[in-house]
Amino acid sequence: MNAPIVRPLAELRSMVRGWKSRGETIGVVPTMGALHEGHLSLVRAARASCDRVIVTLFVNPRQFNNTEDYAKYPRTEHTDAALLAPLGVDALFVPDGDEVYPPDHATVISVSGVTAPLEGAHRPGHFDGVATVVTLLFNMTGADRAFFGEKDWQQLQLVRRLVQDLKLPVEIVPCPCVRAEDGLALSSRNQRLTAEGRTRAAALPRTLFEAARRIEAGAPTAEALAAAQEGLEAAGIGPVEYLELRDGETLGEPQLGRPARLLVAAWLDGVRLIDNVAVTLR
């Protein structure tokens, strides 16, 4: 039996009120659908630690700054429901766009600082769309805990900052990035790669991990990043939008003694791929 699909907000809120009245905890996994093993790992984590699990499926138009990317984003609701069936999801919330954003919707939530570099510099307005929809979904679902993958590292830091600054009563639970056998981070957009492109894409994580290893071994950061850039270009991956070492929390300049993160965004077959890896600075 597929996961029960709930569309009207009033119906979801009625379910949530019943659960809350019994003191049950609610775990939420926000998604845009086109589910893969990465999403399912978040659902399993929610199932293991919460009494009730809601998966949200909403392709948020406000976080796309490219209309073609929005139009091409995979929409596979029935397949998604079937994938969730064995995982014990209590509700697959698929709201109508007009219920999330009525015609007179006028509120935008913007988080500064952590959103400025990397994705923020290349996708204007993207993080405003993310912050706004995440806040809406937390309110709609009554989330006690929300589960986010570390693949979208900058998004994870945004959500943490959002919850902290707005004093939202939601615990943010980070979950490890899930990778294919060749190391490529799982993403709904990967299915748009050609067979040849999918093979070449394995060079992205391989190059990223090698650059991280070199930096941890003491190589100058600029030298390691230049070699990684050359490696990506040699593999036919590009253009590279960014390949940067950043502080793991603030995404400012990395500091000795603090966790750092190496992040990349690059194009292949007309598909934008992102990835990141932890780096220990000594």
UniProtKB/Swiss-Prot annotation:
Catalytic activity, as annotated: (R)-pantoate + beta-alanine + ATP = (R)-pantothenate + AMP + diphosphate + H(+)
GO CC terms in record: cytosol
Its EC number(s): 6.3.2.1
Gene3D superfamilies xref list: HUPs, Pantoate-beta-alanine ligase, C-terminal domain
Keywords: ATP-binding, Cytoplasm, Ligase, Nucleotide-binding, Pantothenate biosynthesis
Misc note: The reaction proceeds by a bi uni uni bi ping pong mechanism.
Name listed for the protein in its UniProt record: Pantothenate synthetase
Originating species: Paracoccus denitrificans (strain Pd 1222)
Gene: panC
